[in-house]
């Protein structure tokens, strides 16, 4: 959490009481790689991903209300915050990416589908608990392995190479 935007987002999101809300993805793992590389902690962070899970209303309008709520609460941070209800992803994913996507049961299920195992990290906004089902060893060591739960070799290799282009010391296994 060396990135001050991460810390501030966690505080502000907690106050919004969004169900199963997690700060996740590049804003977390890139801070670790940036620290090791001597880069500013926010170097290369394009956006700040927020996953939540609310299956009580699966309409786009309901998700848009949460997106707007977060946008208003974080507007002064100067950071692009991407908010997605993981309960809805199966409704639009196949149409957008031409591949099926299972109906999820928890916000963490979305994190579990990341292509690179060590990037499967998130912070539960309500509890502050770190979710890292693969541990942190590979993340700290810069070892990129395919996620065994989502073994798409072509997409994994493209994503891993993209990371390695920015942090050349990363190793693809």
What is each model feature region?
Residues 1-173:
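Catalytic cores of the polymerase beta-like nucleotidyltransferase superfamily
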């Amino acid at each position: 959490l060396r990135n001050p935007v991460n810390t501030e987002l966690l505080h502000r999101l907690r106050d919004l009481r969004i169900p199963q809300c997690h700060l996740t993805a590049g804003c977390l793992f890139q801070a670790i790689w940036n620290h090791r590389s001597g880069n500013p902690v926010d170097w290369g962070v394009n956006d700040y991903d927020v996953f939540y899970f609310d299956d009580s209303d699966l309409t786009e309008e309901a998700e848009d209300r949460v997106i707007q709520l977060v946008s208003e609460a974080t507007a002064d941070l100067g950071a692009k915050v991407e908010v997605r209800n993981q309960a809805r992803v199966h409704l639009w994913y196949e149409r957008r990416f031409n591949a099926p996507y299972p109906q999820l049961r928890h916000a963490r299920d979305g994190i579990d589908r990341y292509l690179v195992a060590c990037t499967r990290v998130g912070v539960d906004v309500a509890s502050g608990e770190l979710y890292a089902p693969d541990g942190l060893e590979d993340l700290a060591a810069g070892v990129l392995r395919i996620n065994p739960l989502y073994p798409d070799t072509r997409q994994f290799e493209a994503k891993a190479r993209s990371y390695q282009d920015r942090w050349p010391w990363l190793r693809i296994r």
